[in-house]
Amino acid sequence: RQRQMCIRDRYVIESYGLIVNKTLLEKAGYTVDDIKSFDDLKKVADDIQARKDELGVKGAFTSAGMDGSSDWRFKTHLANLPIYYEYQADGIDDTDAIKGTYLDNYKNVFDLYITDSTCDGAELSAKTADDSRNEFINGDAVFYQNGTWEYAELSKTFSDDELAMIPIYFGVDDENEGLATGTENYWCVNKNASDEDVQATLDFMNWCVTSEAGTKSMSEDMGFTIPFKTAVAPTNVFVKQDAEYTAAGLTPVSWNFTTMPSEEWKNGLGTALTLYAAGSGSWDDVVSAFVDNWATEKALSE
């Protein structure tokens, strides 16, 4: 649009949700079939948290780390859900003035993450993506918000039968909600590069999605779903589960990251969430960072 930017074909499709250690969940007396709504999730998570010593875990959820390696999970991925539901309710796909209709739901989920956690909220500012992943791998927590891209690492420790991914139930349309599935990944070629380099780049991109080695690497090694006719069937259990949710009639939550105003908006939201989790900021500050900064940053991008 105004920035004269063209986004055409995505080269990968991914999903995110709540990754579940089914073995630990069953040890607590539940299965994934017991969790079909936000209320169900809260009931199960609260119970696990109350019985964490008995169950041998440190918390229901892995740490919601807010350092730079991890905060995108909450200032972007989790923040996508209130945006998605507002867009759906208003019949739009972008806006210069987000209303924050579903920020109470955002709060409910984030509150669950920081109260039923492996650590105190004041510690989250220094918690990393590796911390969160390792807590899950070590059996310290039952739930771990992340995506299909985590499969390659988790499969080194867990069998497919021990893992599941469920939607981040938001308390809006839980009975119809699937995983958050989409992309923000596109290949671009610099037109100012030499003809030789442009052609070499195009040849490599073609190799990635047509050759046996390229498609295997992208599908199996990287855990991607690649939307090309030459794609091999995924071995990633989370990708398979996403397909099962869709086949069952559940609606994938679309990715609306490209409509977020700017990185500055995300960073401001991340800071407000971090302070809120630590008890030194209010939820009103989070709402302001979400709603007021959206309008400001959208205006600056025009």
Across the structure, where does each feature detected by a protein language model lie?
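Glycine-centered hinge/linker elements that transmit conformational signals in sensory
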Residues: 44-47, 90-126
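Short, small-residue-biased leader/transition segments that mark boundaries at the very start
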Residues: 2-7
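Short, solvent-exposed loop/beta-turn-alpha elements that line the ligand-binding surface or hinge
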Residues: 65-68, 83-108, 156-157, 170-179, ...
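Extracytoplasmic/periplasmic substrate-recognition and gating elements
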Residues: 28, 156-221
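Paired acidic/hydrophobic, glycine-rich loop segments that form the ligand-binding mouth/hinge
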Residues: 142-147, 164
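Short helix-initiation/N-cap motifs at beta->coil->alpha
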Residues: 36-42, 123-138
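Extracytoplasmic/periplasmic solute-binding protein
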Residues: 8-11, 16, 42-95, 141
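Conserved C-terminal helix/tail region of periplasmic/extracytoplasmic solute-binding proteins
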Residues: 26, 50, 213, 232-234, ...
